[in-house]
């Protein structure tokens, strides 16, 4: 048991931030994300001796995703937040973005973070999920296919559509500003 625990701590726990990030983007709630990650980590630890794939990160994120889907099935459809930014508190802005010695840079970074959160929050769950896994967590297409239990071609098409949709939301939110995408 001690060897398994040590292996789990060395191989799975370094991906705790990625697990939380995915849960946060799926649930749009800090509290729900924490609950999902707690459930997922318990399940992951109980089944860690069966983990055979090359990527512990992808395996753990698949468990997080499945824990989220199980939670949705148990509690039924959740009320959607009309404005994802309203649902987010100041804790959602990374401290590094708001703590430099340059207040102007801090304001621009905080505004960019809000725009990013808003654009991602407006994407359908399937698009948001693959975009977060690829662009924020750095998973390969194959790993994303494993996490989402979808064919790699579906991952690629969802990712392409997610990028288009994200860009459209980003440009609408930043119309007239100098920091939009080109």
Task: For each feature predicted by the language model, list its residue ranges.
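Conserved RNAP core-binding helix
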Residues: 30-47, 152
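Short, Lys/Arg-enriched C-terminal cap helix and immediately downstream tail that follows
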Residues: 73, 163-182
């Amino acid at each position: 048991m001690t060897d398994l625990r040590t292996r789990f701590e060395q191989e799975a726990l370094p991906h705790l931030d990625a697990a939380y990030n995915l849960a946060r983007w799926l649930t749009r709630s800090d509290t729900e994300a924490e609950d999902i990650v707690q459930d997922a980590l318990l399940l992951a630890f109980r089944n860690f001796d069966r983990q055979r794939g090359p990527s512990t990160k992808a395996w753990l994120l698949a468990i997080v995703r499945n824990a989220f889907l199980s939670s949705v099935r148990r509690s039924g459809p959740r009320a959607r937040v009309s404005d994802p930014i309203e649902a987010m508190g100041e804790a959602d802005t990374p401290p590094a973005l708001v703590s430099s010695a340059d207040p102007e840079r801090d304001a621009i970074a905080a505004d960019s973070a809000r725009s990013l959160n808003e654009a991602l929050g407006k994407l359908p769950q399937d698009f948001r999920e693959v975009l977060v896994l690829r662009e924020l967590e750095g998973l390969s297409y194959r790993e994303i296919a494993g996490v989402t239990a979808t064919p790699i071609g579906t991952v690629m098409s969802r990712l392409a559509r997610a990028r288009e949709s994200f860009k459209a939301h980003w440009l609408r939110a930043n119309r007239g500003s100098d920091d939009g995408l080109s």
